[in-house]
Design a protein with these regions (language model features):
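Short alpha-helical elements
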Residues: 5, 60-64, 92
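Short alpha-helical "recognition helix" segments of helix-turn-helix
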Residues: 43-52
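Conserved aromatic-histidine-acidic binding/catalytic patches
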Residues: 13-17, 35, 50
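Major-groove recognition helix of helix-turn-helix-like DNA-binding domains
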Residues: 53-77
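Basic, amphipathic alpha-helix used for nucleic-acid engagement in HTH/winged-helix/SANT-Myb modules
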Residues: 1-24, 86-90
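Short Lys/Arg-enriched helix C-cap and helix-to-coil transition segments
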Residues: 68-92
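Short, amphipathic alpha-helical "recognition" segments used to contact nucleic acids or chromatin
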Residues: 18-42
Length: 92
């Protein structure tokens, strides 16, 4: 049986890399803020709950990853492309 966490197949270490988590966090932030048009504080709360990290740490990550977010925003991925990359997540 294949084991997965946050949509990624995990090895025997049962961990995913921070880079993978951050990539998914940016994608979820883009989805919630740009496609669903949720308020910033609601998005931060949902990301904090989803990834089990504090809201302050979510904001620090978003600040540190702002270039990646800007690239994603320029590419304007659709829900379908996000769903294709992470099919385990709800993109509706």
């Amino acid at each position: 049986m294949e084991r997965r966490f946050l949509g990624y197949r995990i090895a025997s270490t049962n961990a995913i890399s921070r880079e993978q988590r951050n990539e998914l966090l940016i994608a979820r932030y883009y989805y919630m803020s740009e496609l669903k048009r949720l308020r910033f504080d609601d998005v931060i709360f949902r990301l904090s709950s989803t990834f089990f990290i504090s809201d302050i740490y979510v904001m620090r990550l978003l600040s540190a990853l702002s270039e990646q977010f800007d690239l994603m925003k320029a590419e304007r991925p659709t829900r379908e492309s996000l769903r294709a990359k992470w099919p385990e997540w709800d993109w509706n």
